[in-house]
Amino acid sequence: MIMTRKNILSVKRIVVKIGTSSLILPNGKINLSNIDELAFVLSDLNNKGYEVILVTSGAIGVGLNVLGIDKRPKGIADQQALASIGQVELMSLYTQMFRRYSQKVSQLLLTRDVTDFPTSRENAENALNALLGLGIIPIINENDAIAVDEMDHQTKFGDNDKLGAIVSKLVNADLLIMLSDIDGLFDKNPSIYDDAKIFNEIHEITDELRQMAGGAGSRFGTGGMTSKLAAAQILFENGQEMVLTNGERIREIKEIIEGREIGTYFHQKS
């Protein structure tokens, strides 16, 4: 018997966040097939009347690929330079892939001082609503080329998992679908323990869950499970919902929206 998440059936405005691990192959090359499939699925959803926003990571990972560098540099300025180079190439790829399906896209680069300041936050919200009204799929990334995270001037979100949640809050999205390198939230690391069990639903971010989530992301990205729980907490505080699922099976986005029990569904009990 196929179980259904009935709350999801009524969603209209969707934010999809894709992580670096879903865009960059383990060998550092760009995962072109995943980007193409993402463009197809999101274009199809847009054609069916859904409002879709894409939050993407990957600028630094793509920058590494463009320059043929294997190891992510530690220096902030070097990382910012890579992000600047990679963002141009990343948007070029997205534009090409979405064009195959006659879908127009736009780019927004955000920093925390935009979303934290009321006037600029309202301007960003108005721009996004206008784009959605035109049938455009906005593609959002953090402006890594200028974002810093220092005591006296914090403009960095920390990771794009949090950015996905903040964008969802900004546009009052019905659902955030977070594409990662794992099928969902497990009770233990599934790459180590064969008996690891996936959580079908999570209704509260507890200290126990936070302790269970550990480790950073891949060598190309920064997002680990801890950041995903932090993103879910932001949504919980705003009465919003999220599904965490595997970015290697992008076509399952359609099934998620149809209410199929895929990944881990983060929502508060009604």
UniProtKB/Swiss-Prot annotation:
It is found in: Cytoplasm. Its main location: cytoplasm. Its EC number is 2.7.2.11. It catalyses: L-glutamate + ATP = L-glutamyl 5-phosphate + ADP. ATP binds at residues 17, 180-181, 222-228. Pfam families: AA_kinase (PF00696). The gene is proB. InterPro entries: AceGlu_kinase-like_sf (IPR036393), Asp/Glu/Uridylate_kinase (IPR001048), G5K_ProB (IPR041739), Glu/AcGlu_kinase (IPR001057), Glu_5kinase (IPR011529), Glu_5kinase/COase_Synthase (IPR005715), Glutamate_5-kinase_CS (IPR019797). It comes from the Bacteria. Gene3D superfamilies: Acetylglutamate kinase-like. GO terms for cellular component: cytosol. Substrate binds at residues 57, 144, 160. It is an enzyme of class 2 (transferase). Catalyzes the transfer of a phosphate group to glutamate to form L-glutamate 5-phosphate. Belongs to the glutamate 5-kinase family. GO terms for molecular function: ATP binding; glutamate 5-kinase activity. Keywords: Amino-acid biosynthesis, ATP-binding, Cytoplasm, Kinase, Nucleotide-binding, Proline biosynthesis, Transferase. GO terms for biological process: L-proline biosynthetic process. This is Glutamate 5-kinase. Coiled coil: none annotated. Pathway: Amino-acid biosynthesis; L-proline biosynthesis; L-glutamate 5-semialdehyde from L-glutamate: step 1/2.
